[in-house]
Amino acid sequence: MCDASGACDMRHVQNAFTEEIQLHSLYACTRCFRTHLCDLGSGCALVSTLEGSVCVKTGLVYEALYPVARSHLLEPIEEAALDDVNIISAVLSGVYSYLMTHAGRYADVIQEVVERDRLKKQVEDSIYFTFNKVFRSMHNVNRISVPVISQLFIQLIIGIYSKQTKYDACVIKVSRKKREDALLKQMRSEYGNAPVFGSGV
C-alpha cells in the first residue's frame, strides 16, 4: 500500500503494446508500480452509484458491459518516469496473459507464479528488479521493443518455474538471436539475485 490511507495512485497505462494486444483497462500505481486490470474481476473495488458501478481503484464507471473511463477523475500520464511503469505493466500483463492463454501447457508454471488472478508479488518484484538491472540500468530499453522484452520475460519465467523444458515456437524464437540470448542469460542471473530470493532461486 502506498499512502497513509492505503490507497494507490492508479494511472491508465496506454502504449503501443497495450494497443497491439487491445488491453484498454490496465492501470498502474505511480508510487509502488502495482498493476490493476480493471475488468469487473475480483481485483476491482466496486461501488454502486446512480450512474452505475464505479471501481474505486481506477475511477472507471461500468454503465453497461464495457467500462467507460472518467477523464475528469484520471489525469493523463505525462511524466517521463512513467515510461518504465508502462513497459513493466505491459510485461507483467504479457507474461500473465500468455500463461493463461496456454494454461494447459504451462499449468505447473501457473501453479508456481499465479495467485488470485495475478502474478504473485514475489514474481512481480523479481521482474521489476530484473528489468531495472538488465534494461533500465544498461540503457537497453530504447534499443529493444516492448514485445521482445515481454517475450524474453515469458521465456525466463517458463524456464525458471517449469518442471520440464516445454517452450513452444513463439516463446523460443526470441532468444535465437545472439543479442537476445545474451540478455536472457543476464536476466536469469539477475532474477535469481532479486532480493526476494535472497542468495538465488
From Swiss-Prot:
Domain of life: Viruses
Pfam families registered for this protein in UniProt: Herpes_UL92
Membership in a protein family: Belongs to the herpesviridae UL92 family.
Official protein name in the record: Protein UL92
Organism encoding this protein: Human cytomegalovirus (strain AD169)
